[in-house]
Each structure stands twice: as structure tokens, then as C-alpha cells.
A protein has these predicted regions:
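Bacterial Sec-dependent signal peptides at the C-terminal "C-region" and cleavage site
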Residues: 18-33
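Extracellular ligand-binding/catalytic regions of CAZymes and related secreted enzymes
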Residues: 30-38, 62, 110, 133-138, ...
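Catalytic beta-strand/loop cores that center a nucleophilic Ser/Cys/Thr
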Residues: 154-242, 283, 369-382
Length: 382
């Protein structure tokens, strides 16, 4: 009987001891906390434009390591840079971007960097880095030395390879009017910087311009206070073939490697174009991400370049989110545009307007004006 009692006591106490031991072990080795996401602020106000803005938003938002925050100039003036880790200034117009922030408030960007923030700029975003704008790194630009949209050759030097964790060599990249820059011996900038590689080919309009273009820094990197700055004169965000360069830029300023996972699509999804011309702001980005995440919607970004290549022949629906009525009216006013959109709608294509395209595009039964708060997905999937 004593043996039975001892056995029962042991079996009752053993789980308690095990639980106690486990508690001690857990107390000494607590479960790892969830990894904090990199908070990336994307500037979407006036001066941020074009497909590049939406490509950047997709790369960031679809990366599990990052959280996308869209920023207007008023957000920066209100001190919201303190809530992010990296500021991204996209292509568009650098003067307009600075004006949207307010020239009296550009010091907030510099303070953000002094305190350890990161800065990533493409095209206009590189203009902002230069002596002529925010004075973040000791570089400036030649006047009227750039060119039109084209594929050009860019060097990835040994510094770039190490800083971005990519392979050195010569790469083909998309260029579209970015700054042709040069290093300054005497600069007003507090920052220190280096070239990550130079242009090896040119789209300049003259021999004189070409002499400035070839051999000029295509991208630059440096420090400003405790923060890090990287900027590209070209557009690595556009094409999958250069995404490693774009993602390397985020790594260079944050130490975090973004690995975007794009939404999978079902067989034969609805082919949708998003007109990105004049479409900055929070809502167009939110709309883009909402559409892109749906498995039955295959989304393309559309500007004049894509229209000229005949993209409307491959779309079922075109969504127009821009609120800039005067600019849209001018955009759709040419005989070529009128013909393109008439053929698109006559052949069954549908235009969904949640912006201000009404009156800019000729009336048609397939032109549908939607309420501002409409669920665009529902109309597309009808």
C-alpha cells in the first residue's frame, strides 16, 4: 500500500516539477519578440508622380519586413518623420516636392537624418539630395545635361557592391531625365558622400552634354549626421531586372533586406490599367494596393509612354484616379488620345473614373463616373 501511495504521489508531483522547470527555463529564455518592421515613409504629395511612385509603393508594401506609410508635405510639417525609419522621395519634380514640404520646413528632413533616419531618392529624389535643393550630400548637377527616357549603361563599382550587397559590374537601367551630377570640392552640405558608379552611355542631345553625362555619378551614397543617404539618377524601381539595385538601396540605409512577395493571380484575371499621370496622394496608392492584392485583377500602371506603345489593346478596364481636372483635360485633348480612347471603349473597354476625367474624355456608355468612395474592385469584377 505504501509503495502504491508513493507511486501516486510521485506521478502527481512530477508534472508540477516539470512545469516549474519549464517556467524557469522560459523565464531565463523568453520567447523572441516579433521582429519590428521597417517603417518606410513614401512621399506622395505634389511633385511625386509617374509609374515609379506606384512601383516603389508595391515593392515596399509587399515586403513582409516593411510597413508602408504614405506622406504628404503637411505630414512632414506636422513632425510625422519621427514615426518612420526611412524616407523615400520618388521621381517627379524636385522643386514641386520641396515646395509641397515647404522650403521653411526642409530642415525637418535634415533633422530626421541627423537623428539616424535613412533617405532613399530616385530621379527627382536625387535632385533633392544635391546642393541645389536640400544639400544632403556634397554633389551638384549640370544644367540641361540630361536626356529623355531610355535604357543606359551604369557602373556598379566595388563600393556599391559592398554597400548594397549586390554584384559589381555594368548594368542596363531605365533613365528618364534624372540629374547629371558632379562632386563638389567645397560644399555647404554637412553630409559626406561617394559615387557608387558612373554612367557608361548617354542619352544627351549634344556632344557637349554627352561629355558631361558619360562618367558622371549615376548614384551616390553617404552619411548626414547619424543617418544614411542614397540616391539614384536612374529608375531601378521600374523593372524586375533592376529590383535588386532598388532593394539594395533600402539595405544600404537601414541594414534591412526587403524581399517582396507579390500577390499570385488566378488564371485569366481581369486586365486593369491604372492611369498614374497626375495621381499622387494617399488614396491612389491605397487603391493601387487594394487592386493589386486581388487574385482576379492583373494591374498595370499607365502613363503616356505606355499609351503610345498600345497598352489599351491589352486592357479590359482603365481606372482614372487623378483629381487634377485641368491636367487631365490637357492630357486627353490630342487627336491621338481621343482616337485611342474611342477605339478602346468601342471595342468593349471600360473606363472607371473616380477622379476628374469627366469632360476630359468624350462621352460613351463605357465611361462610368464612380462615387469618390466607391469599391472599385466590385465594378471591375462585374
Amino acid at each position: 500500500m505504501k509503495k502504491v501511495f508513493a507511486w501516486l504521489l510521485a506521478t502527481a508531483v512530477l508534472p508540477l516539477l516539470c512545469c516549474s522547470c519549464a517556467s524557469d527555463v522560459n523565464a531565463q529564455n523568453p520567447a523572441p519578440a516579433a521582429e519590428k518592421k521597417l517603417r518606410v515613409g513614401l512621399f506622395v504629395d505634389n511633385g511625386a508622380s509617374g509609374n515609379g511612385l506606384f512601383h516603389l509603393a508595391g515593392l515596399i508594401a509587399h515586403s513582409p519586413q516593411a510597413e508602408l506609410v504614405t506622406l504628404m508635405g503637411s505630414d512632414i510639417r506636422a513632425g510625422k518623420l519621427k514615426d518612420i525609419d526611412v524616407l523615400v522621395m520618388p521621381g517627379g519634380g524636385s522643386r514641386k516636392q520641396c515646395n509641397a514640404i515647404g522650403n521653411d520646413h526642409l530642415e525637418k528632413v535634415r533633422d530626421f537624418l541627423r537623428n539616424g533616419g535613412g533617405y532613399v531618392g530616385t530621379c527627382a529624389g536625387m535632385f533633392n539630395v544635391l546642393e541645389c535643393r536640400m544639400k544632403l550630400l556634397p554633389f551638384d548637377r549640370y544644367l540641361n545635361a540630361g536626356g529623355s527616357t531610355a535604357w543606359v549603361s551604369v557602373e556598379v563599382n566595388q563600393d556599391a557592391a559592398k554597400i548594397l550587397d549586390i554584384k559589381p559590374g555594368i548594368r542596363k537601367v531605365r533613365y528618364s531625365g534624372g540629374p547629371v551630377s558632379y562632386a563638389l570640392a567645397n560644399s555647404k552640405s554637412e553630409g559626406k558622400g561617394i559615387s557608387l558608379g558612373v554612367y557608361k552611355s548617354s542619352v544627351s542631345r549634344s556632344k557637349e552634354q554627352e561629355g558631361k553625362f558619360i562618367g558622371s555619378p549615376a548614384w551616390i551614397y553617404g552619411s548626414y549626421g547619424k543617418g544614411k543617404v542614397i540616391a539614384t539618377s536612374f529608375h531601378p524601381e521600374y523593372e524586375e531586372s533592376t529590383h535588386d539595385m532598388m532593394l539594395g538601396c533600402f539595405y544600404a540605409v537601414s541594414g534591412v533586406k526587403l524581399t517582396p512577395v507579390f500577390p499570385k493571380k488566378n488564371y485569366r484575371p481581369v486586365r486593369v490599367g491604372l492611369l498614374t499621370s497626375y495621381a499622387g496622394g494617399h488614396k491612389p496608392i491605397e487603391l493601387m494596393l487594394d487592386l493589386e492584392r486581388h487574385p482576379d485583377i492583373d494591374l498595370d500602371y499607365v502613363m503616356a509612354t505606355e499609351l503610345d506603345k498600345g497598352i489599351l489593346k491589352h486592357l479590359d478596364v482603365l481606372v482614372v484616379p487623378s483629381p487634377q481636372k485641368a491636367m487631365l483635360k490637357k492630357f486627353f485633348a490630342t487627336d491621338l488620345r481621343k482616337k485611342q480612347f474611342a477605339e478602346f471603349m468601342n471595342n468593349g473597354g471600360v473606363i472607371l473614373d473616380i477622379g476628374e476625367a469627366e469632360g476630359a474624355i468624350q462621352p460613351h456608355k463605357n465611361f462610368i463616373k464612380l462615387p469618390k468612395n466607391a469599391d472599385v474592385k466590385k465594378y471591375i469584377l462585374k
